[in-house]
From Swiss-Prot:
Keyword field contains Metal-binding: yes
GO CC entries: cytosol
Native source species: Streptococcus agalactiae serotype V (strain ATCC BAA-611 / 2603 V/R)
Gene (UniProt): uppS
Identification of the protein by name: Isoprenyl transferase
Signal peptide positions (record): none
MF term (GO), any: magnesium ion binding
Assembly and interaction partners: Homodimer.
Family, as annotated: Belongs to the UPP synthase family.
Active site: 26, 74 (proton acceptor)
Keyword Magnesium applies: yes
Length: 250
């Protein structure tokens, strides 16, 4: 059992640590605007926040941390911003992977990665290769990821198996669909997030893990992502500890 010490408050036990946490990292641009800085500086600060949160989650015993790094819809942003964001994984992996490796963190990526710029793709591959034998927390980047696209592709794969008589339609189950989703590479027990956190005060999923989040608990905070550090993660988990997950039952 972990003990979280809140400032000027009593110690709060963390008896339930969510095995899989998903984070929609939102608010980088607004963080920069408040400080009269270019939007790209908010993305850079967000990268530093991710490193701190990852190490904190690993220390708490979280098994999987899935972070929404870049959606399929984000390509519509200004070209200069997209170019900068695409370079962030290169900087993140080069700067922080040695420390993540020391903490037994394994890096993994889901999304349509073949459409990424070569430098981004290569940096991603290097990070995954370096950490592939680690047995600790899985840092799962959703990069060029879209939930509806993921489900659509799963349906196409299953339909093709039916067309080729490899599969009977009556044999299609929820587990079968899940096995065709990008999260099928995660440990079976941890594929679906127990807790999804969204920063910046927005109250929506934005196409993030729509299938996998069916029974997730949600935590929305007005804190902008670059300001979401170790203490904010603890607050989210304290809130999670106060929930009673019923999974549709009473």
């Amino acid at each position: 059992m972990f003990i979280f010490k809140r400032k000027k408050q009593v110690e709060m036990p963390l008896e339930k640590i969510p095995a899989h946490i998903g984070i929609i990292m939102d608010g980088n641009g607004r963080w920069a605007k408040k400080r009269l800085k270019p939007r790209v500086m908010g993305h850079k600060a967000g990268m530093d926040a991710l490193q701190e949160v990852t190490i904190a989650a690993s220390g708490l015993g979280v098994k999987v941390l899935t972070v929404y790094a870049f959606s399929t819809e984000n390509w519509s942003r200004p070209d200069d911003e997209v170019k900068f964001i695409m370079n962030l994984p290169v900087k993140f992996f080069d700067k922080y992977v040695p420390e993540l490796d020391k903490n037994n963190v394994r890096v993994q990526v889901i999304g349509d990665t073949h459409k990424l710029p070569k430098a981004t793709y290569d940096a991603m591959q290097r990070a995954c290769l370096r950490t592939k034998h680690n047995s600790g927390l899985v840092l799962n980047f959703a990069l060029n990821y879209g939930g509806r696209s993921e489900i659509t592709n799963a349906i196409k794969e299953i339909a093709q198996d039916v067309l080729e008589a490899k599969l009977n339609p009556d044999d299609i189950t929820e587990d079968l669909v899940a096995n065709h989703l990008m999260t099928n590479s995660l440990p079976y027990l941890y594929r679906d997030p127990d807790l999804i956190i969204r920063t910046s005060g927005e109250l929506r999923l934005s196409n993030f893990l729509p299938w996998q989040s069916a029974y997730s608990e949600f935590y929305f905070t007005p804190v902008l992502w670059p300001d979401f550090k170790k203490d904010e993660l603890h607050k989210a988990i304290v809130d999670y500890n106060q929930r009673h997950r019923r999974f549709g039952s009473v």
